[in-house]
Amino acid sequence: MKSLTLLTICAVLSVSLSMNDLALDVVLDPDPAAEPAPAADSSASSSASSSSSSASDSSASASDSSDSDSSSSSSSSSSSESASAEAMAEDPAAATEPEVIMKRDLASVLLRRKRAAGPAAAAFTLTQVESLSEVCELNLACEHMAETAGIVAAYTAYYGPPPF
């Protein structure tokens, strides 16, 4: 557990140093009730050590691990909170930009599909579409494209715009 705490602290420090954030923000809890409790635990573990050596080893290690767990969790949460606060302080609109871009991209794709399929297919009669498909049947690649992308797109790609 101590090694996990040390690895977490080292990871936070390395990330902050790599981002050139040399001023580390350390936030201490001003909760006075939390501070006397660890002192009482340490005195209990020292009194236990005088009565029994094996009991003191286990209680001291337990109190040490709980102290280090609480300090590491508070420091890691404060560093993550400060990192997110700094990110929001730098550019608050940056968090919403990707969503808007994605919506615009989706809308433009749907609009292009509607424009490509709608008027082109509706402008031709059934006889005209049939004559385009007869011309495309002669070319295997055009016929395959007609099956996947549509006859008008395939004819336009291989032979140019339809003559009618």
Swiss-Prot record:
Residues 30-99 are annotated as: Disordered. It is found in: Secreted. Residues 30-95 have a biased composition (Low complexity). Gamma-carboxyglutamate residues are formed by vitamin K dependent carboxylation. These residues are essential for the binding of calcium. Residues 128-160 form the Gla domain. Residues 1-18 form the signal peptide. Keywords: Biomineralization, Calcium, Disulfide bond, Gamma-carboxyglutamic acid, Metal-binding, Secreted, Signal. It comes from the Eukaryota. The keyword Metal-binding applies. One of its GO terms (biological process) is regulation of cellular response to insulin stimulus. Ca(2+) 2 binds at residues 134, 137. Residues 19-115 form a propeptide. InterPro entries: GLA-like_dom_SF, GLA_domain, Osteocalcin. Its main location: secreted. Ca(2+) 1 binds at residue 130. Ca(2+) 3 binds at residue 137. GO terms for cellular component: extracellular region. Disulfide bonds join 136-142. One of its GO terms (molecular function) is calcium ion binding. The modification 4-carboxyglutamate is found at residues 130, 134, 137. Belongs to the osteocalcin/matrix Gla protein family. Binds strongly to apatite and calcium. This is Osteocalcin 2b. It comes from Oncorhynchus mykiss.
